[in-house]
């Protein structure tokens, strides 16, 4: 429990367009994310002690941005600390936060196709392209790579070398917040 700044407020803004038939559709979605709590060295040490209780077969999910008061290597530091414990670690983060942990062989990483493309400096528009670059992340150390592609579905490149492609379900998106988090949770539940 942190003593100062215990809450973080994130605001999601959606721009609606009204079509000729009067139907409203989301044309753009923007995020304004708060900074999060202040974390002291003492509080960080307590957190590390809690991590030390993890054992073989436990699952740890490292997701999202990190507070600015923590080192930018915090995910990597956590994985290094736990590497001999055989904890199954999932990382859902962007560019450097994600790439920097690959040497510690995360069980699952979950970028979206835009984040995956950003890592390699390319635009990925087909599932075949996504599979190619997901395999590159495996070569860099990830065991399983699950890539969400919004309305175009998803791709999984599994640690046994199999690849799976899925279409997105039909429907009208009301809000995409948490979609990637729920995908990672669904994968873990089904695993």
What is each PLM-predicted segment?
Residues 5-7, 35-37, 65-68, 115, ...:
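Short glycine-rich anion-binding loops that position phosphate/pyrophosphate groups of nucleotides
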Residues 19-34, 107-118, 132:
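A polyampholytic, Gly/Pro-enriched intrinsically disordered region
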Residues 46, 59-129:
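Conserved beta-alpha-beta core of the PfkB/ribokinase-like small-molecule kinase fold
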Residues 81, 99, 127-191:
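Conserved phosphate-binding/catalytic region of the ribokinase-like
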């Amino acid at each position: 429990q942190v003593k100062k700044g215990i809450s973080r407020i994130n605001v999601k803004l959606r721009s609606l367009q009204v079509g000729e038939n009067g139907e409203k559709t989301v044309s753009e979605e923007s995020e304004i994310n708060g900074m999060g709590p202040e974390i002291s060295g003492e509080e960080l040490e307590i957190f590390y002690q809690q991590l030390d209780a993890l054992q073989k077969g436990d699952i740890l999910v490292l997701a999202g941005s990190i507070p600015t008061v923590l080192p930018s290597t915090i995910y990597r530091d956590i994985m290094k600390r736990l590497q001999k414990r055989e904890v199954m670690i999932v990382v859902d983060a962007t560019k450097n936060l994600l790439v920097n942990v690959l040497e510690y062989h995360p069980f699952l990483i979950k970028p979206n196709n835009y984040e995956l493309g950003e890592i390699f400096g390319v635009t990925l528009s087909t599932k075949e392209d996504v599979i190619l670059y997901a395999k590159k992340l495996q070569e860099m150390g990830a065991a399983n790579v699950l890539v969400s592609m919004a309305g175009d579905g998803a791709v999984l490149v599994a640690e046994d070398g199999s690849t799976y492609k899925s279409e997105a379900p039909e429907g009208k998106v009301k809000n995409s917040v948490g979609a990637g988090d729920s995908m990672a949770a669904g994968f873990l539940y089904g695993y």
